[in-house]
Amino acid sequence: QWYRPDYQAVIVVGDIDVDAVENKIKTLMSDIPVPAADAARKETITVPDNEDPIISIYTDPEMQGSKIQLFVKRPALPAQMNNLIYGEMFDVIQAYMTTMENARLQEISMKPDAPFLGAGMGSGEIGVIPTLNATTFVAMTQDGKLAEGFEAIYTEMEKVRRYGFTQGEFERAQNDLMRRAERAYANRNDRRNGEFVQTYLNNYSKNTPMPDAETEWQLDSMLIKMINVEAVNGFAQQVIYPRNQVIVVTAPEKEGIVNPTAEELLAIREKVANAEIEAYEDNTVKEPLIPEGTVLKGSPVKKTAQDATLGTTEWTLANGVKVVVKPTTYKADEVRMSAVAKGGLSILSDEEFYMGEMMPAFNSMSGVG
């Protein structure tokens, strides 16, 4: 019913002898029998609607970290539409929505009193069911703080449903999406084989398009510029609603940790739904980090050294800082920088070393940083 030739495809990408590989595949697979005409076919799975939220709470003594997920289910876009411009436009609108909402959630997570350690929003496929999509909110919280985290993400979801996004948020998201598209096009000749495989696999299994890089760039840049904030807000209202919700909690089962019950989660949901919620206030400063015309005070170069083997240039500055520069052609329009200072684990005693090595993990789990 499932594993049979008419449901299978072989995708090969790489520096190969095409004829030899094709003949090898035919030799290996041609003996697989074709199913009988009356053989059972796989069923199309349809997930039923639900008016009241479905809530699942999973706790385990070995569970690491507390997490709550909120799914708002919806039918998937019909497969025959995935290969049309409408399908690509649908994806771009989703990208706008998730980019703007994730920026809001990140802004909250950076506050000293943030109700979660981290949170995110997604939109699209859910699990392995091709007929089902969902808008998803997820929050990771300190142990025992799931109720606060759930109230926060439900409030943010309700805020988007009621008020949508601002023009300022949209413009920043547009710049971000354009940069992503430009970067993908600039690196079109450096794509890995796995990227091609995934594109062809999606075309076979989901009927998504597989355009060349030039066509993809032209289409995506056109759609990114064509879509406006009203279209995104309209889409958000269509995919965020009180029915078809699923809430999933995963948390440690330990003494002293109190996790919310299903009844408590429903009460939080009801509280937020009936609350007066203010629209998002966009206070982002549009000024550049370094104003144009600013003269930066640097440190003069005292020594220059070349390493022909590594292809690097090392500058030693008057203040003692060493700068190593290596030009590459790996990726177009990309500059990577990192800075390292002496200290850290190297200044700890042998007895303190292992505790110091574990400290970042403890900090992360405790909500620091």
Show which residues each predicted segment covers.
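Proteolytic maturation boundary segments
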Residues: A9, D17-P112, E171-N175, R179-E182, ...
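M16/insulysin-pitrilysin zinc metalloprotease superfamily fold
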Residues: E22, I108, I126-A186, T208-P209, ...
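M16/MPP (pitrilysin/insulinase) zinc-metallopeptidase core fold and M16-derived inactive scaffolds
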Residues: T99-N133, S338, K342-G369
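A conserved hydrophobic secondary-structure block that centers on an alpha-helix together
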Residues: Q1-Q8, D19, M365
